[in-house]
Amino acid sequence: MVLASATLTIMAAAIIAPSLPAMGEVYGEGVLVRLALTITSLAIAISAPVAGLVADRLGRKPLLVVSLVLYALSGTAGFFVSSLPVLLGTRTVLGLAVGGIMTSVSALITDWFDGPERGRFLGFQQAFASLGGVVFLPLAGVLAGVDWRLPFWLYAVAAVVALGAIAGLTNEPRSAQKAVPGAFPRAAIGIYLIALIATLTFYMAPTQLPFLLRDLGAGPAVIGLVVAGSTLTSVAGALVFPKLPQGRITGAGIALLGAGWALIGATDSIWLVTAGLLVGGFGVGLVVPNLNLRLADLAPPAQRGRVLSGLVAGIFLGQFLSPLAIAPLVPAVGIAAAFVWTGVVTTVGGAILALGYKEKN
């Protein structure tokens, strides 16, 4: 049930990506429509530290179950609302739920496993999270082709997972239940920053790419399928991650993300756009579990919920900031050129990060 819960996290905001062009026609195409997707990420970023505190003090399982129920209710509510402000409100509540799910899942895995097994299962966590995108995004694209509101019903899956969590989850270790004061590991701040920047770049896929693909002649079903391509290779990256030397994985993964994004912007072929997404998604699949593992090693058991929640906050703050940071570029140079410039900068940054690690070691 823990890994099943992970499938609901990354796709939570992106599942309405195929609906964005139709939503733009209903509400007016602009930043606010894109925020219907990313305001969920802001709510996750804000709520994650609180969720970490709750996980450390009250337990991982109660937080997970309550968050799953809230996820199902707030997610499906989007089908029924008729105004953009109310829709943004339901998406905000959804974000609170995802913050609790991600934090409790990461804390449970790091409580249950040590050493190589921990790295392996953190890779599984990222793989299952990405797998949720592979399964749900194409389905959302098909549903959006019928009615842009239908994808909101996919959030109801969380109700089934909640029942399984209630019945199937074992008690967590006692060390995880009793939080004690301690110094916060300052090295975690740099990890949070890397996660924010990488995710800000990666989230151009669901927020900007649907409009680029529409201009290339793609419909909602194709948009959902193509965007899901990035999550497909994220699964591969996360599964390969435990078998690679960990030192330079983060820098190499970020460089791959940048290379993929540069390819997206440099072509007018949907096939090559898909290839760029596959490369970038593989890079992200390497980065996230490695950052998770480093944080788990830094944090004592009683503080894991809080320390790991900072990574959740960094990831989803990057998602929220993505359309805002890219917005000035799009009218100035166009969506395609925005991908090129972002990709070049990201590739250089990842290479510097990887080479810098090599020099220190």
Regions found by a protein language model. Give the residues of each.
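Structural signature of the two symmetry-related core transmembrane helices
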Residues: 62-76, 248-263
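Paired small-residue
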Residues: 70, 74, 85-94, 271-279
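Helix-breaking motifs and short loop linkers at transmembrane-helix boundaries and internal kinks
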Residues: 28, 59, 80-86, 114, ...
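Helix-to-loop junctions at the C-terminal end of transmembrane segments
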Residues: 48-59, 236-247, 330
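Conserved MFS/SLC helix-loop-helix module at the cytosolic interface between two early adjacent transmembrane helices
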Residues: 46-83
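Helix-loop-helix hairpin linking two adjacent transmembrane segments in secondary transporters
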Residues: 115-120, 124-168
